[in-house]
């Protein structure tokens, strides 16, 4: 346990806090250490070889120096042997789960593991795989390995002499016929393999569990095999990531001598408020990633629930939902203004039409002296209002009494019933209707209204606005303008809709509107966002 003790000394000197999950792993190692063959020699050989031959391939080109924590990880991966049922001495540890905050060099570390296995693993004709959600992610780790063949003096000589070479299938170390290949997360393709080292990258992106398909082939055909699951945590629930977290936290897994879990994460959400606790999720912070970068992300997330979710998931290792309420009470506050701001002013319209079930909203915005003003006509049918529960009906009644929600005495929303109200707003304010944005799925229903107010032969005054993640830029712009008090509204129904509005966070960090509860109506928010997009488009 030489490297465990060195890591503990390092943590004490640098104020790094160990969470309860890592403490459990340490207890497990102590138990295992007393039962099995300790391979200090193999671990030290791997560490020295890596530090002698490997380079950082981004930023300054310099040799890698593994931190005490990373050396300990190598001790867990390579430090113990057992005697199997055939009487053969084999590597004890088959599975490692590394849950580690974003920017901590997971892919670079895995590149060293792959090359150490290919060249020093002593296995003739073996195969190593990097498995990822898609080909782009798989290439990330694959390219880290390939870059070392150009950066490292030793590997470059191997490369130049065709000892280490690229093939159509991947990379090959010809002396031992060991290969390294990339593969996407496809259960059918994984059947029947016989790989010895498997790197499952960013497992929080996986829906179905491919691990058993890969591990089955390794387990049946290889004496020495190892699968390493790496992730920065994520927002996809009920997939492989959640299964792994649950498994590696369990008592059953604690007594499985052939695996180690490295769950670097906060123990609860409240701990994020004290920066000292961040070392629970980012044990290498200060080296990778930089303190300043993580602090900047934390500060940027203040006042933005969606960014806070992402920070807790990707930086602090906590399983978070991919949906979060988006606007804060400060964002949605009412500011009184007079509708005269629309008088003779270019006015942009967004319309979100729902025939029945949700609300229909027609939002008007105009610009004046650096601020955007909005007013929204919101509609429903009386039969829907009458079916509400008491609490919701009282809320809607307030909107009706304020003149902000218009109830129509029809079975469903008829576009022709909206026209008198639009006419009334135009007459009352003297606004100049300029452009309209609408959901293309509703065009045939809205066509008459659009042509009535926004006809032009080139169609420049009309825009079909794709819904979903395509609205990302304008969703974020609306948030920004509300937070800076540069978008002004004075309607309770709009405040309610904004407070109802959640965003779903995509894999690339894009947002799309959604709602958490059926009773949460967000149609005025959607209409306002489309109107804002039209206003911005007229400035470009």
From Swiss-Prot:
Cofactor(s) demanded: Mn(2+); Mg(2+)
Superkingdom, taxonomy of origin: Viruses
Role noted for this protein: Probable terminase large subunit. The terminase large subunit acts as an ATP driven molecular motor necessary for viral DNA translocation into empty capsids and as an endonuclease that cuts the viral genome to initiate and to end a packaging reaction. The terminase lies at a unique vertex of the procapsid and is composed of two subunits, a small terminase subunit involved in viral DNA recognition (packaging sequence), and a large terminase subunit possessing endonucleolytic and ATPase activities.
Keyword field: Endonuclease, Hydrolase, Magnesium, Manganese, Metal-binding, Nuclease, Viral genome packaging, Viral release from host cell
Binding sites annotated in the UniProt record for Mn(2+) 1: 352, 424
MF term (GO), any: metal ion binding
Enzyme class: hydrolase
Similarity remark: Belongs to the skunavirus terminase large subunit family.
UniProt KW Cell membrane keyword: no
Protein name as annotated: Terminase large subunit
Species of provenance: Lactococcus phage p2
This enzyme's EC code(s): 3.1.-.-, 3.6.4.-
Binding-site positions, Mn(2+) 2: 352, 523
InterPro entries (alphabetical): P-loop_NTPase (IPR027417), TerL_ATPase (IPR046461), TerL_nuclease (IPR046462), Terminase_largesu-like (IPR005021)
Cofactor remark: Binds 2 divalent metal cations per subunit.
Pfam families, per database record: TerL_ATPase, TerL_nuclease
PANTHER family: PROTEIN YMFN, PTHR41287
Assembly and binders: Interacts with the terminase small subunit; the active complex is probably heterooligomeric.
